[in-house]
Amino acid sequence: MSDYKLKNVCDFDLAQTLECGQCFHFVKLDEEDYVLAAKGHVLHVSQEDDTVTFYDTEEDEYVNVWKDYFDMDRDYSAIKKKLLEKDDKLKDAIESMWGVRILNQDFFETLISFIISQNKQIPHIKKIVSDISAKFGTYKGTYGGVDMYLSLIHI
């Protein structure tokens, strides 16, 4: 299986998107290198500047799964511009988190993550999600030394 490279990506920062607290079923392998489970797949993904590499991912998997998951068809530049026209108080937030995209996650995983997130911090939530997946999920392989299981929706 080959790698799929997405070049000239705008308004996307992989680290900001994954680590902002909207998803928890991922492991950071390196500075810009992650493995995550979502939509019935395990993805090893990294970003260097404006190029995102989806390892062991064919183009059809990117188009059918990850393009929607990472909301890559949406024009975030236009959204940010419109927000700033209406309220310049958002400028600092937009500038500091310029690369966050809204992930299109499975409803059940989002719901369970929200329920267990009450009064907890991100590292603890990630551990709980990982433990639940390891106990009840289907093993998908080892990536970067980390055992990965299917997303909670597939339990």
Q: Locations of the language-model features?
A:
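HhH-family (HhH-GPD) DNA N-glycosylase catalytic core used in base-excision repair
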Residues: 1-153
